[in-house]
Amino acid sequence: MRELMSEFKELRLHGMAGAWEELTANGGSRVEASRWLIEHLLQAEHTDRVMRSIGYQMHAARFPVHRDLAGFDFEQSKVDQKLIRQLADLSFAEEAQNVVFIGGTGTGKTHLATALGVSGITHHSKRVRFFSTVDLVNALEQEKAAGKAGRIALGLLRMDLVIL
């Protein structure tokens, strides 16, 4: 019963937690027989919430296109594959460090940066925001002209990873 109660509370289903506690106290074996159904429903709810959260975060990140590391051709690039895979764990973000990709047009900088952002959302539950530098500067200028300076900066401070 303990794991069901913690699942109810983790999902903020406090009314169900109280009802389950009452049912198990009064219902005995009939209630225990339906335990598998409740466990299955809780797992489905948890999975659905995770998937909706990922979908929301992917939309909020505003990536130009969806890219991941599986789609990057390391054979055609001089990029250190081991280093990129190491960066994908996002430990640099936890340590408040920056990563800068330098290279000419078409070398995969945006692809790799987007892939790190996608990895951050899907595997590490990070909040990510992608901006082209030109779009960010324009948005900051518009914000300043509207007399609302600082709102974008406050929004970016809430992010775990900002990609420019």
Task: Report each predicted region and the residues it spans.
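Conserved P-loop
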Residues: 53, 81-158
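Interdomain "pre-motor" coupling segment immediately N-terminal to P-loop NTPase/helicase cores
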Residues: 9-64
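Conserved AAA+/SF3 P-loop NTPase catalytic/coupling segment centered on the Walker-B
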Residues: 160-164
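Short hinge/gating elements
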Residues: 6, 19-26, 70, 97-103
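N-terminal pre-Walker A segment at the start of P-loop NTPase domains
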Residues: 67-88
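Extended, charged alpha-helical coiled-coil/arm scaffolds that mediate oligomerization and mechanical coupling
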Residues: 1-7
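Alpha-helix C-capping/helix-to-loop hinge sites
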Residues: 23-27, 75, 143
